[in-house]
Amino acid sequence: MSKKRVHEIAKELKSHGIELDNKEVVTELSSLGYDVKSHSSSLDDDQATAAVQKILDKRKPKQATPPVTAKGFVVRRKVGPPAGATADSGAEASQAAEPAYEPPSAPEPATFAAEEPVQAPPPVEAPRAPVEAPSAPEPQRVEAPVAAATEPTAPAAVTSTPPAQVAEATKAPAAAEVASPPPAAEAPQAPVEAPRAAVPAPAAAQPRPSVQESTTLPQPPPRSPVPPAVRTPSSTSSSATVVSRGPAPGYQQRGGPGGGRPGGPGGPGGRPGGPGGPGGRPGGPGGPGGRPGGPGGPGGRPGGPGGRPSYQGPGSYQGAGRPGQGPVRPTSAPGTGVQASASASPIPQGPTIMVGGVPHAQVSPTGTARPTATQAVVISRPLIQVRRVTPTAGQAKQYPMAPGRTGIPERREYKVVPDHLGRGRELVDVSKNKERGQRKRTSGDTQSVSKQELTDMVWGRVTIPIRGKKRKPTKKGAKTQITQMAEEKKVIKLQEGISVSDLGQRMGVRSAELIKKLMGLGKMATANQLVDADTAEMIAGDYGWKIDRVGFEVEDYLPEVETRPEDERPRPPVVAIMGHVDHGKTSLLDAIRKASVAQGEAGGITQHIGAYSITTARGDVTFLDTPGHEAFTSMRARGADVTDIVVLVVASDDGVMPQTVEAIKHAKAAEVPIVVAINKMDLPTANLDRVKKDLATHELVPEEWGGDTIMVPVSAKTKENLELLLENLALQAEVLELASNPLRPSVGAIIEAKLDRGRGPVATVLVQEGTLKLGDAVVTGSHYGRVRAMTNSRGEQVKEVKPGYCAEVVGLSGVPGAGDAINVVADEKAAKQIAEHRNMKERQTELSKVSRESLEQLFAKTKAGGGPKELRVVIKADVQGSAEAVKQAVQKLSTHKVKVEVVHSGVGAITEGDVMRAAASKGVVLGFNVNPESGAEAAAKAQEVVLKSYSIIYELIDGVRTEMEGLLEPIRTERKLGRAEVRNTFNVPRLGTIAGAAVLDGVMKRGAIVRLMRENKQLFSGKMASLRRFKDDVKEVAQGFECGIGIESFNDLKPGDIIEAYEIVETRQSLT
């Protein structure tokens, strides 16, 4: 179901003439009970429509609903004019009335007789019409001044039109206009034979021009006039209502136009047909007791036998009804109608209603009715659908509605609301009914309507009869049908592994159930723990699922390169300088570069990998300076992996050291040729032969000894044989025939990476293949980005880097790991996909390492005293390589007593977040070549977190070892101080019992821990409360002196007791 917002409701109100802004509309809706907060709040379509209608009803005056009349047609006729009426008054009355239908043509008007109001009018002379008395089964004749044939409708009562409405009465189709006052008409006299010989002939009517005359029947009781009522077709009455009255003085009929509806034959007790107009229907024969048919006009209806002849005289009109309404009943003119019997008694009660020839009811007028009053007669027939005639707004006053519950159906108001299932609509009765109140329609009355019909219903407040959709009956309480997934669709695609919760979500199985399955397989797992593809396939098979292993191939996203020899170009060699710490590696490089990098290193040792490109007489050479400390093992290994030649620097006075051996192993593992530079040849303690001998033990045999290892004795201080070293490097590069394709997408290696405060992540990249250019999309490890800027080793901004050269690259999403490969891809989108895949694999690997302890392991740890202590550290370093080296060095310090756990290691300054991370894990923060931020120091003091920064690697290691020893419980030992014998006891108020003792040996110190011995048994151990000599408080009393000793919480002292004094000494445990 669609929704409408408040501002849309305001626009809709504006289209209806209600000017309200959004705030006012929100206020109005809130007052109506709708939950709206602002102009962007929304309501359902039905609620919005109902709310608009309520606001319109409140803001706009409600228009009167046009009255709905009963279905059928109304027959109206004019009675004689009132006494004293003049032609002018008749004309004014005729002009004042609004005709419901204008006849096509009107013959000359007939004249009306008018008398003075003070004089009694003479009797009206009615045409004589003898009525024969037929036999019992034959129809009888009923004398009436006027005969009219109408189509039967629902039976209705007859009422006289009030005088106030006479001027607004509608003219009959053939109403005559008043031309001149004619002479007084004679009273009609017509003998009437009672139908079925049961009704006596009425007497002559009294000369009352305003009172109607009709046949009288003694059977029906008189009743007061009631307004005409419309009865439904299902009424049990099946006869028509006949109204008869005497003719007005001087009233004449005139022939109507042709085309009128023909009259039907009169039934038993029915009304005879009237005179037919040109082209009208011929009159049918009168039934028993009915009125005779009138003479037919040209093409009109002939009079039937046995009935009362209808009159056709001058000025009489044949029935020509309004379109779609049937013929208008004819009226009689003076001298041409049926005369009333002179012996007929006057009937002051009013007209008699005949139903099927039998008197149905008698109307007793309460006042004098005007002869020109219009009377409505509603005739009905059972089981015939009638048409409802609804007058316009202007005609509502002229045609009053028939009252009564059966005449006008009850109006109900309904509200359209969603049904209880939310799939359809239903109508709720909101009519004001005190008896029933609001009632909800049953499901059988539920109807589906269109949006336009709903809108019309709400705006017009009317019920639209619509047909609802047929729905199949459903059984209550039927269970929901669950559709089973096809077997070919029950496939889960995996790359490496999947978490338990994700696997359960894909199969539609609860995670707790899968955990039970894993426990049955002997694996303890949590909902977020990853399981490998094999385990997932085993579990999924139990539920009818299959595992499809789909590997993520990075090669699919990397550009394909065709290697062609003609595209290869020579490139400069990459040389890594390796060796033991303090053997002069950086000094030798400074001598070659003619710079002084070693002076800038903290502690005079190299703790980073430095990449430098140097131009020599033999060409360009790229040097990588690696650290020699044992903590930087990974750096040396990384340097050996990306280099072409390794220069092993060995001090001539120290010879081969542990890191020298390690460097030899890294170079051999990388299958890189080694050139040995024996440094410090300027020292008097230099021993070249010893160094060569030591190297030969590690399979590095010099060329002069028949080997293939180039050894050059050099001196970084005196720059001895530096040119010879460079020449040998060039020769070795020519032997290797180093070449690469500069046209292919670039491939390189991350030598070092750091987080610069101004530039962000900065990576030192060694380009191995292709040309790295500005704007290239790159991916390295789990990070990606676009090359924003590049700086060479001399600090110059460059736009491209050729193979064999180094540069600092800015633009990565994070600090990459040292040693990671860097690749140029087609676009940044592909780089992001590769990085996200690698990040997911790293996360899966980390989660798979986390395992829950079994109950046996937990009991064993508790029994062993909780297991080894743990030192949790947070490491921050200036570059990624240093952070990795520090992490490895710290983890190597773990022993069986204390285990070091690295909570986090990163690059950059120490932040407040690092301090909070350490506080949460109850650890320490270690910084290497970085300083803490201002907020970090304050947070460390507030959280009581140890924060230490170091610039030299071995100082950091010593500090960590000290922290580890501090976690161990100290060793507590007793150190004996002295002994004293109790000679006497004294009771001192507020101090208790004081022992007068003599010091036997050692020293008695105040505050020491004492042990009371009695007969070589310990009675009490506590703290010495006081120590006095005479009246003075003293700190200690030596051997051979007497003193007073008080013991806390102990007064049971006796002479001869021995008091031993001692103290607890704590010593720190060692990590071993």
From Swiss-Prot:
Residues 253-307 have a biased composition (Gly residues). The keyword Iron-sulfur does not apply. GTP binds at residues 579-586, 625-629, 679-682. Signal peptide: none annotated. Its main location: cytoplasm. Residues 570-737 form the tr-type G domain. Residues 715-717 are annotated as: G5. SUPFAM superfamilies: Initiation factor IF2/eIF5b, domain 3, P-loop containing nucleoside triphosphate hydrolases, Translation proteins. GO terms for cellular component: cytosol. Keywords: Cytoplasm, GTP-binding, Initiation factor, Nucleotide-binding, Protein biosynthesis. Residues 604-608 are annotated as: G2. It is found in: Cytoplasm. Residues 579-586 are annotated as: G1. Residues 91-100, 108-118, 126-179, 186-212, 231-245 have a biased composition (Low complexity). Residues 625-628 are annotated as: G3. Residues 218-230 have a biased composition (Pro residues). Residues 426-436 have a biased composition (Basic and acidic residues). Pfam families: EF-G_D2 (PF22042), GTP_EFTU (PF00009), GTP_EFTU_D2 (PF03144), IF-2 (PF11987), IF2_N (PF04760). NCBIfam families: IF-2, small_GTP. Belongs to the TRAFAC class translation factor GTPase superfamily. Classic translation factor GTPase family. IF-2 subfamily. One of the essential components for the initiation of protein synthesis. Protects formylmethionyl-tRNA from spontaneous hydrolysis and promotes its binding to the 30S ribosomal subunits. Also involved in the hydrolysis of GTP during the formation of the 70S ribosomal complex. HAMAP family: IF_2_B. This is Translation initiation factor IF-2. The gene is infB.
